[in-house]
Amino acid sequence: MHPAHEGLSAMPFYDDFDLSTVDVLLISQYVYAHLACHGSWGSAHHWSRTMSAQRALAVQRLVYHYEWNIICILPLDFDDVPFPGAHQCIYHFGPFFLTPFLVVSPSNMLTSGSFHVDHAASLPYVLAKTNFKGRVFMTHPTKAIYKWLIQDSVRVGNMSSNSETKIQMYTEADHLNTYPMIESIDFYTTHTVSGVRITPYPAGHVLGAAMFLMEIAGLKILFTGDYSREDDRHLVSASVPPGVKIDVLITESTFGISMHTPRVEREAQLMKAITDVLNRGGRALLPVFALGRAQELLLILDEYWSKHPEVQKIPIYYNSSLARKCMQVYQTYVSAMNDNIKRLFAERMAEAEAAGDTGRRGAWDFKFVRSLKSLERFDDLGGCVMLASPGMMQSGTSRELLERWAPDPRNGVIITGYSVEGTMAKQIVHEPDQIPAIMTRASNAARRPGQRENEQTMIPRRCTVQEYSFAAHVDGKENMEFVQEVAAPVVVSSAPLHTHDEDARTNGVIDSGSR
């Protein structure tokens, strides 16, 4: 046992709870069954000497199955506490219920590892609707994008949910009113709250994503959250905190033991798939999340177009009003990105100055990508490449284009990220003969004479479908290498019940427990 465990009783919040009243095995099983998310709850008392090995392992499993790193979760209330679902954009704010064990102590601190909704979307609820009185930390880019992303999610949820089934967990006003409570912090800076020290380190994954090193009474715990170690065009990849002996490592295992195709090979396959569609006169649809991998894909496409004059007359469109707002954040935080994007930024500046054009010299000022404000302004004639959100194609622009383009065999859909079960993105990968029409215009066009009003309208699917993963998560090999580099005596890994790779569920993962 780590000697720091003995020091926990001296912590200011230690007397606020009684572990003997908590059935952590039941809690762990409930979380596994009901929460499809992949952040982390952390608590000083999880490592208490009062726990048996079995109970400690159960809590270790619990630690990695909620949306933030939170210090000191108190089992004081057994009423149902509703929290937003992990993927609200898909489920239209349908809630999961954490039952029956949580209220949050006023002495807590809260950190968000990234701006993605499955890590941050419950934050306005916690700040506006619970008794949480602690401090909240995000990196500067995470906080900047979080503001726009959650605001957009609330608006989309309000528009897409009918009044009979809608359960609104919080309002846009709740989000904006609690936003000033969030403190922006820099990577590599240490912050102390109630004797707990936290230090954020780059996690790769998306702009601003952070791993958090926590020190509790001398015990050092590293939460990776979602992280990536692959060299790409703009992110600083995750690395082991230098000069720190980690006692407990809590890491994601999104892809289990499966391994990514090498990056160069994946990019070549992606570009061949796109150009094959274009060469037959078709349109290539890439459904994407508005922020995250979409920016990496735009860099890949813009670079390829700049090197291949034969495709430069074919337009690349990016349709996302949210992304247009947030691209200024990407421009602002180029200094927080890797050397590849910094070099591109310097080259663009030099080119612009040489041409006397001071208006287009940012690394994110694309040469061949056009921002599309709405489909009303889209001249749908001839071949093109279209990156459109949402990534799951449950509704919105990507779904409307899918329904419009699916009947034409010249067109192609290319999936570039993970696909959630039950969504159109997951269904289309299996190449169904037909897809349901849910968008008004496509539905009306496909309606048969004499079809009943409530009868489901189906659209033939003749377009090609291909899938190439560019999800910014470590694969099994990268994760294992990171675990070995950290060399922590205790390693806790997310279980296969939540993984973006369905094959990993059957292939197995690094499981929770001690090395």
Describe the predicted segments one by one.
Residues 9, 204-209, 216-247, 252-262, ...:
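Active-site-proximal loop/helix segments of hydrolase catalytic cores
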Residues 3-10, 42-44, 51, 56, ...:
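Amphipathic alpha-helical heptad-repeat segments
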Residues 1-111, 116-120, 124-296, 300-315, ...:
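His/Asp/Glu-rich metal-coordinating catalytic cores
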Residues 90, 222-224, 230, 252-261, ...:
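Acidic/glycine-enriched edge-of-secondary-structure segments
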Residues 25, 212-214, 226, 249-251, ...:
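Structural signal for hydrophobic/aromatic residues that build the beta-strand cores
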Residues 33-34, 98-99, 488-490, 497-500:
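Conserved tryptophan-centered aromatic signature that marks the ligand-binding surface of SH3
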Residues 24, 221, 247-249, 283, ...:
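Structural motif
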Residues 271-453, 477, 483-486, 494-495, ...:
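Hard-cation-handling environments
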